[in-house]
Curated annotation (Swiss-Prot):
LRR repeats lie at residues 51-72, 75-96, 99-120, 123-144, 147-168. Coiled coil: none annotated. This is Leucine-rich repeat and transmembrane domain-containing protein 1. Residues 28-288 are extracellular. It comes from the Eukaryota. One of its GO terms (cellular component) is membrane. The keyword NADP does not apply. Residues 180-234 form the LRRCT domain. It comes from Homo sapiens (Human). Residues 332-345 have a biased composition (Basic and acidic residues). Residues 1-27 form the signal peptide. It is a single-pass type I membrane protein. Its main location: membrane. The gene is LRTM1.
């Protein structure tokens, strides 16, 4: 009897846990919706209904997400964490959310994202990272996101974006990139090429407006011609690996080349995207070609006119001298014929 009573009590407690709604939250069981927004929460509430599909946690004071922070809601599809104080996302913070489709992390204090942070979100369709302080995104944030269609990273501190990260999102159709600190140098050429192909295929983007260097500040990256890019310099050889032993050096002494303290600065300057220098005499060359063509045309016309004039003059002269000559020749022929006829047979 006591065993049955204990079992019954356990079932009651379990049902209360499953069906309960956390304090300061509003739960709607018919739609599996839980709203815990604007409650001054500092951490994720415990005892969330496991059948929750939509969870709103925006406008709180959550600073940190531990690993497996949402293990109690494995069926979650929409998660809104916007306008909190998140600065640290532990690896595996979203582990177990196999069905998550929408993740909103806008208006937080994120500085960077750990590689493969979202690797457990295969169904993710929308990721909003806008209005943070992110200065760098890794080349990968997880497995290939076959279903991701919207990525927003506007209003951050990004200077570069690796093309490999975008190539891991073959289905993306909307890309929001504005209001960052884009440095339009040679390292952004790969991104430019990817964006041109993306737009050509019908993708939508708000563009990349260059913040530096001053030559291109305020310009749209997609409107800068390819010809204006300088190739990125090759990485400087490692002085340690490039050590060489000169022939004839005594006792195997290794001579190191002198260090160039300005190499890094020079590489940075060479890498700046700057206009391709145009030859100083290019306009003069074009003008020379045009003038030469005009002169040659005039000379050809003059030669043609001279040829026509010469032929006409020759024809008129021949006709003029041909008439009298014919008349003077005829009497000779007659006289010769008479002498021939009068000769003895």
């Amino acid at each position: 009897m006591k065993g049955e009573l204990l079992l019954f009590s356990s079932v009651i407690v379990l049902l209360q846990v499953v069906c309960s709604c956390p304090d300061k939250c509003y739960c709607q069981s018919s739609t599996n919706f839980v709203d815990c927004s604007q409650q001054g929460l500092a951490e994720i509430p415990s005892h969330l209904p496991p059948q929750t599909r939509t969870l709103h946690l925006q406008d709180n004071q959550i600073h940190h997400l531990p690993a497996f922070a949402f293990r109690s809601v494995p069926w979650l599809m929409t998660l809104n964490l916007s306008n909190n104080s998140l600065s640290n996302l532990a690896p595996g913070a979203f582990h177990g959310l196999q069905h998550l489709q929408v993740l909103n992390l806008t208006q937080n204090s994120l500085l960077s994202l750990e590689s493969r942070l979202f690797h457990s979100l295969p169904q993710l369709r929308e990721l909003d990272l806008s209005s943070n302080n992110i200065s760098h995104l890794p080349t990968s944030l997880g497995e290939t996101w076959e279903n991701l269609t919207i990525l927003a990273v506007q209003q951050n501190q990004l200077q570069q974006l690796d093309r490999a990260l975008l190539e891991s999102m073959p289905s993306v159709r909307l890309l929001l990139l504005k209001d960052n600190l884009w440095k339009c140098n040679c390292h952004l050429l790969g991104l430019k090429l990817w964006l041109e192909k993306f737009v050509y295929k019908g993708g939508l983007t708000d563009g990349i407006i260059c913040e530096s260097p001053d030559t291109w500040k305020g310009k749209d990256l997609l409107r800068i011609p390819h010809e204006l890019y300088q190739p990125c310099p090759l990485p400087a050889p490692d002085p340690v690996s490039s050590q060489a032993q000169w022939p004839g050096s005594a006792h195997g002494v290794v001579l190191r080349p002198p260090e160039n303290h300005n190499a890094g600065e020079r590489e940075l300057l060479e890498c700046e995207l700057k206009p391709k220098p145009r030859p100083a005499n290019l306009r003069h060359a074009i003008a020379t070609v045009i003038i030469t063509g005009v002169v040659c045309g005039i000379v050809c016309l003059m030669m043609l006119a001279a040829a026509i004039y010469g032929c006409t003059y020759a024809a008129i002269t021949a006709q003029y001298h041909g008439g009298p000559l014919a008349q003077t020749n005829d009497p000779g022929k007659v006289e010769e014929k008479e002498r021939f006829d009068s000769s003895p047979a």
